[in-house]
């Protein structure tokens, strides 16, 4: 299935408008503006939500992005920090949607972010929510004007990677947002999406390194943040709420993560 055939703007304009309203409500309630460019401030926004914590550490599986889970009554979003920073940011916004909608336990892989599999409406809505939150329409139009992009013919790879740097999002996210605001036609969008995004020898990643624009968002940060999960596991041990084998395994893993961070 073609990426555009899974894009909500094309598949269901009514659903698109609904998600737009959800993003606008969240921006007004938690961000303070509907045109603020968040970049990695998305993590601060998540941390400001009272009953939500973020856990971050690297996992040697770049197809595995993150997930939402509940542990002892507390909600956590896990993010794999072996991903490029831009995809960590997108993962955070994607999982935020699931938390806001229904607190659903949800595992996110790279195919879901890239939309390279059959349409899953909830996952597509989460991707759209993330894209609208990270690339607000008014902010995007303002940046297009600053870059003197008035029509599709004005777009160049250099301008695309500048937009990626400004909003700290992956290549496909920028291209799909340009389609959603109707700067690009379906055919033009497909032509842009045919360009390799992650090949370091050609395409977008090559141009990023060549021009040294937005390289910070390509870093695999390997950052470790355990929030209060370790304390919860220890408390569970003291209260005998978890099997001893599981507690030992969990604590061993967290000790290993702590050691890697040091």
Task: Briefly describe each language-model feature range.
Residues 1-262:
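Active-site hotspot residues in diverse enzymes, especially metal/ion-binding acidic/histidine motifs
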